Amino acid sequence: MSAPPVTERALVLRIAASGESFHKIDILTAESGTFLCLKRLSKNRSQSTDPDLFDTADIQLDTSKQGTARFVKDYQLVHRHSAIGQSYRKLQHASDFCALIAQNGPHMADPAALYHITERTLDAFAERALPAIVFLKAIYILLKDEGYPVREAWWPELPATLRQSAKQLIYPPTPNSATPEQLEACAQISRNLCRWLRRETDLILPNSLA
C-alpha cells in the first residue's frame, strides 16, 4: 500500500523530459530537502498546472508502492519568477545555482535553511539587474551557511588585488548598476571561489561551472 499523499511548498530547480508522458522535476522543500519527482504531462495544460523553472508551488506528492519514486498528484502555482527567463544571463546564472543545489542538496544538513537561501536567491535573480553579482553572493552565503571556512581559508587565498572588490560585491545589497571593471572583477572572484569550492569541499559543481 502506498503512503498517503503529502503537500509541500516547493521550489522548482530543474525540469527534464522523461519519455513522452512525464517530466522529471528536481524540487526543494523546507521539510524534505531536494529530491526528484515525476509529473505526468497533462492533455489540458495550463499556465498554473504546468511547472516552470524557478516556480514556487504547493505540490501534492504520491509515493509509489515500492517507495522508490514520487509522483506529482497536484500542482498549485504560488509564484512564478518570470523575470528570470526574460534575460539570458539571469537564466544562465539562476540555472547554474539551482543545478548546484539539486546536485548537492541531498547531502546538506538543514533543508529549511537551504530553502530560505534558495528562495531569497531566486527573488534576487528576478528583481536585480546584475545576476553575476547575485550568483557570487549566493555561492559565498551558501558555503558559509554550510560551515565551510570561506572567510578563514578562501579569503586569504584570494589575490590581494581582488579583495577590495570582493568586499564591495559580497557584503552590501546587490546594486542595479556596475562598471565594466566591477563586472570583470566579479567574474574573476566567482571563478576563484568555484575553484576553491571544487578543491576544498565535498560539493559537486555542475558541468556548466566545472
Stretches found by the model and what they are:
Residues M1-H23, L28-A210:
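Non-catalytic alpha-helical scaffolds and adjoining flexible linkers that form interface surfaces
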